[in-house]
């Protein structure tokens, strides 16, 4: 079953699903802006198109991830994103 989610006044939208090949996940698009997300469990984020400038927990330097690149976020933490152009992503819940 698909589950639609909307965050930050509609600037981030995602569709959650469960797949036998990758497990529980969501795909979505982020409009330009700055966002802070909290995690309940570890997440693996793959940039599908565009780019995300990311500040991960415990780090002091922002890093840019582009299409095809992956980063991991620990559970029970926050991470910060800067988005300069509409960017799509795949989030796997680990």
UniProtKB/Swiss-Prot annotation:
<keyword id="KW-0328">Glycosyltransferase</keyword>
<protein>
    <recommendedName>
        <fullName>Pyrimidine/purine nucleoside phosphorylase</fullName>
        <ecNumber>2.4.2.1</ecNumber>
        <ecNumber>2.4.2.2</ecNumber>
    </recommendedName>
</protein>
<dbReference type="GO" id="GO:0047975">
    <property type="term" value="F:guanosine phosphorylase activity"/>
</dbReference>
<dbReference type="GO" id="GO:0004850">
    <property type="term" value="F:uridine phosphorylase activity"/>
</dbReference>
<keyword id="KW-0808">Transferase</keyword>
<comment type="similarity">
    <text>Belongs to the nucleoside phosphorylase PpnP family.</text>
</comment>
<dbReference type="Pfam" id="PF06865">
    <property type="entry name" value="Ppnp"/>
</dbReference>
<dbReference type="InterPro" id="IPR009664">
    <property type="entry name" value="Ppnp"/>
</dbReference>
<dbReference type="GO" id="GO:0004731">
    <property type="term" value="F:purine-nucleoside phosphorylase activity"/>
</dbReference>
<dbReference type="InterPro" id="IPR011051">
    <property type="entry name" value="RmlC_Cupin_sf"/>
</dbReference>
<dbReference type="InterPro" id="IPR014710">
    <property type="entry name" value="RmlC-like_jellyroll"/>
</dbReference>
<dbReference type="GO" id="GO:0005829">
    <property type="term" value="C:cytosol"/>
</dbReference>
<comment type="function">
    <text>Catalyzes the phosphorolysis of diverse nucleosides, yielding D-ribose 1-phosphate and the respective free bases. Can use uridine, adenosine, guanosine, cytidine, thymidine, inosine and xanthosine as substrates. Also catalyzes the reverse reactions.</text>
</comment>
<dbReference type="GO" id="GO:0009032">
    <property type="term" value="F:thymidine phosphorylase activity"/>
</dbReference>
